[in-house]
Amino acid sequence: MKKRRWKKMIALSLLFIFFSSNHIPAEPLPQDNPDETQEENEIEIEEPKNLYALSACLMDADSGRILFGKEEDVRRANASTTKIMTLIVTLEHADLNNVVTFSDYAASQPDVQLNGASGEQFLLKDLCFSLMLESHNDSAVAIAEHVAGSVEAFAGLMNEKAAELGCMDTYFITPNGLDKEDENGFHGTTAADLARIMSYCINESPMKETFLEITQTPSYSFSNIEGTRNYSCNNHNRFLTMMDGAISGKTGFTGNAGYCYVGALRRDDRTYVVALLGCGWPNNKNYKWADTKQLMQYGIDSFEKVNLLELEIPKEAECPLEISGAKTEDYSRIKMTEVQNRTEEKQIENILLRKDESIEFKLERKQRLEAPVEAGTTVGTLKYILNGQVVREEKLVLKDSVTAWDYR
């Protein structure tokens, strides 16, 4: 990938559109140092290159914005990275103090295994550590059967959650990520969807703290309910000690999926998620760490957090609106009433911008209205645009009601 040279964009661009299609050019904001030379304002950004993974995604976990992608929307098998969804569904649907009994089917799962015996009982909490630290396939099935009654029903919960999170190219069949296919397709996801799931697990889920506690634990020991067998688990997510700020992650491997990984890192007020699919096959176990570090470092070096609510919006957005036919103290029948912006649903407030990027505004607003009008009447929209995509939209509404002139 070639290096790109960019001029530092200090000003926000503005596209102002009246309903009559008038245009106002952008006006730059004052620079921090107007004496800076062009060379001093020049920014050099090098994008990730030579990644091993077939699919890769770097995501801003707070906004869901994809900061870098390589075939990030191609569905592939994802092996044990599946287990982040298994864990979050379990945490949101069951009490960790429940007792889980291994079935014959759970006990028959292939390696990697806890080697629980059919009929053996464990605390659900203990099996969650087994699931995430050692990636035990039998524990995943035992958990699924306990939470939903069957693996199939649990997969239904997983797919419901995926759809809820906007993961449109994800289909889960197994709770452990083992390769499988049925009449609806094959078990798999995309790098972008996998990053969305991890972002939810660490940022939005009501059980995010428990998710982080489990996935950050270096080692964990427990026994079965009878106390006749003891078990020890060690965390195989080496990325936790590779970079400052690493907070979670899950590895995966099958012969079909190759090495896979999803991990999260938090630096100050920025949270990054990396998802990798098909990142090498034996003997290339360390490719995923190289790709993860390169993507995370790119995010740290190249992006800054911007609070959209602190940006200076176009002054034209909230200037008074002309209301004709209004009841006034004189005979003008014209009243100027205030306009304010508001949002009625949850929208992005903070977003990571690359140092060569800027937000543009698109303003659509009526020029005048006829009385009577009610407070809260929508008179336009203010859109925040990044690289041609709307990242936030606010309604412009009348602050006060205006009564019509009584001609009687």
Name each region found by the language model.
Residues 8-9, 84, 267:
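Hydrophobic alpha-helical segments, especially transmembrane helices
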